[in-house]
Swiss-Prot record:
Name of the protein described by the UniProt record: Putative thymidine phosphorylase
InterPro entries: Glycosyl_Trfase_fam3 (IPR000312), Glycosyl_Trfase_fam3_N_dom (IPR017459), Glycosyl_Trfase_fam3_N_dom_sf (IPR036320), Nuc_phospho_transferase (IPR035902), PYNP-like_C_sf (IPR036566), PYNP_C (IPR013102), Pyrmidine_PPase_CS (IPR017872), Thym_Pase_Put (IPR028579)
Pfam families listed in its UniProt record: Glycos_trans_3N, Glycos_transf_3, PYNP_C
GO MF annotation terms: 1,4-alpha-oligoglucan phosphorylase activity; thymidine phosphorylase activity
UniProt keyword terms in alphabetical order: Glycosyltransferase, Transferase
Enzyme Commission designation: 2.4.2.4
SUPFAM superfamilies according to UniProt: Nucleoside phosphorylase/phosphoribosyltransferase catalytic domain, Nucleoside phosphorylase/phosphoribosyltransferase N-terminal domain, Pyrimidine nucleoside phosphorylase C-terminal domain
Length: 516
């Protein structure tokens, strides 16, 4: 007899209008006979089943019949959609067995090395919704605290890749680009994709939303167009326009990655091994054959020393080579934000200025994007080495990149409402006269997040001065935009005693790294 058949009391299914993001949550009334008979506890995992379907969910116990009655079982919005049964359907409820793969997590917490089978079991259970957020957090902390050797990273990459669909473009060269993050602004992908696509090379760019930054590529692109594209729409769009700027979450590309990101984001976790596996599994799932990786180095970047950048590059190359991906990694300047805007709307302004060849466009964003695009164009066997930059520049200056960007925007679904920077604004001013010799990337990113970015699209930071600029006492260094009073006050309080700028003598100017 199955567990479902052994339970005599069945409950009526009820959707509960609560957004629990990617976690399945179930709701039982405290006076429910099943709750009392089974000895359930709040936050325990339960299994809900009927008609051969099953779903596991974290249990929440309620006392209000307006949420669920004693004869009902409630499921959060996401869980109800995944379960796929109508409201009022009779369902059975049972204790869920803990996932067997948690043994691997416990062994990793103890410092053991895991093999491919362990990671395959863990990622499979996560993909099936058998891990709660607490269990996923335990896995992330274990792999972050105790680290992953390069073969473990390879195993995790392959395991994550197997949990979702893998796109195939049936072309010998499918390009992609990725930055490991940590640098505010830096919205080069929104320039590289139209340049490369205008050249005719396939570049289906799928991106995550922000994890610990004020905006990810998908967050910024959503100011201009839809990014939540179904796989069939994505396929049609890319074949027509040769490129896209889409969110990877709706295409089920390595879905475990998105589930882990939902836990990484609030915890601020972004460990090296997880990062490599996350990036490469997503790129392989998107069908990439050639990848250009941007590793910024700077005193307040994710990677702060050149030796660490070289080590990370070797790890990417090791894993990339063994999964059949042609990968080139370049080390770039991470001493300060790239562009002037930090936050979705402000970053879009910078991007469009570059595409429109506006003389006010940020020079650093334009130059970095052209250099990276040039390296990607040199993947093309018909482009001679060293000529990629000039080809990319010609595509930009001729207006072909702008035209291609507008076609991509229209194909993805142009946003009807024009978004503007937040209406609540304050300026952060220099406390002394001198030269800007250092800028704290993390501080400015945190300021933008406190102001509401990326959830509030118009929130963020607009830089008025960069490294090497001479400023006077009391001169504005940057403006902070917010859409809601609470965010405005959070950001203003955060910047009340610090600016994130180091102002001093030009002799102490932060050294930069650039490798092209």
């Amino acid at each position: 007899m199955s567990d479902e058949e052994s339970i005599k009391t069945r409950l009526k299914l009820r959707p509960v209008a609560i957004d629990t993001y990617r976690e399945n949550v179930a709701y039982l009334h405290r006076e429910c006979s099943v709750y009392r008979a089974e000895g359930f506890q709040a936050l325990a995992k339960i299994r809900v089943g009927c008609n051969g379907k099953q779903i596991e969910a974290v249990l929440n116990v309620v006392d209000d019949v307006c949420i669920v009655a004693p004869d009902e079982l409630g499921l959060s919005e996401q869980a109800f959609q995944r379960f796929g049964e109508p409201a009022g359907q009779l369902v059975n409820v049972a204790q869920a067995e803990p996932p067997l793969s948690m043994d691997g997590v416990r062994r990793k917490i103890g410092g053991e090395r895991l093999d491919y089978g362990d990671y395959q079991a863990i990622t499979s259970d996560i993909a099936k919704g058998r891990y709660s957020k607490m269990e996923m957090a335990a896995f992330l902390v274990a792999t972050g605290q105790n680290g992953l050797d390069r073969d473990e990273v390879l195993s995790l990459t392959r395991a994550m890749l197997e949990t979702g669909v893998r796109l195939s473009w049936n072309e010998p060269l499918v390009a992609d680009k990725h930055c490991i993050g940590g640098i505010p602004g830096n919205r080069t992908s929104l320039l590289i994709v139209p340049i490369v696509a205008a050249h005719g090379m396939l570049i289906p760019k799928t991106s995550s939303r922000a994890i610990t930054s004020p905006a990810g590529t998908a967050d910024t692109m959503e100011v201009l167009a839809r990014t939540d594209l179904a796989p069939e729409s994505l396929d049609r769009l890319v074949r027509m326009e040769r490129g896209c700027l889409a969110w990877g979450g709706t295409t089920r590309l390595a879905p475990v990655d998105d589930m882990l990101i939902s836990v990484e984001r609030p915890l601020g976790i972004d460990s090296q091994g997880q990062m490599v596996a996350s990036i490469l599994s997503k790129k392989l799932a998107a069908g990439a054959t050639h990848l250009l990786l941007d590793i910024p180095v700077g005193p307040t970047a994710k990677v702060r020393q050149m030796r660490d950048a070289m080590s990370l590059r070797k790890l990417f190359e090791y894993v990339g080579d063994r999964v059949g991906l042609h990968l080139e990694a370049v080390i770039t300047d991470g001493a300060q934000p790239v562009g002037r805007g930090i936050g979705p709307v402000l970053e879009v302004r910078d991007v469009m200025q570059v595409l429109e060849n506006d003389p006010e466009a940020p020079v650093d964003l334009r130059e970095k994007s052209l250099r990276l695009a040039g390296r990607i164009l040199e993947f093309d066997p018909d482009v001679r080495g060293g000529f990629g930059y000039s080809i990319a520049r010609d595509i930009l200056e001729s207006g072909r990149a702008l035209a291609k960007m507008h076609r991509i925007i229209d194909a993805q679904g142009r946003q009807e409402r024009r978004l503007e920077p937040g209406r609540l604004v304050f300026e952060v001013r220099a406390e002394r006269a001198g030269v800007v010799v250092g800028i704290d990337n993390f501080f400015l990113a945190q300021t933008a997040r406190l102001a509401g970015a990326p959830m509030s699209r118009g929130a963020g930071v607009d830089l008025l001065n960069k490294l090497g600029d001479t400023v006077e006492e009391g001169q504005p260094l940057y403006r902070v935009y917010a859409e809601f009073p609470a965010n405005f006050e959070f950001a203003r309080e955060f910047t009340r005693t610090r600016s994130g700028y180091n102002i001093g003598d030009a002799a102490f100017l932060t050294k930069t790294h650039m490798e092209f």
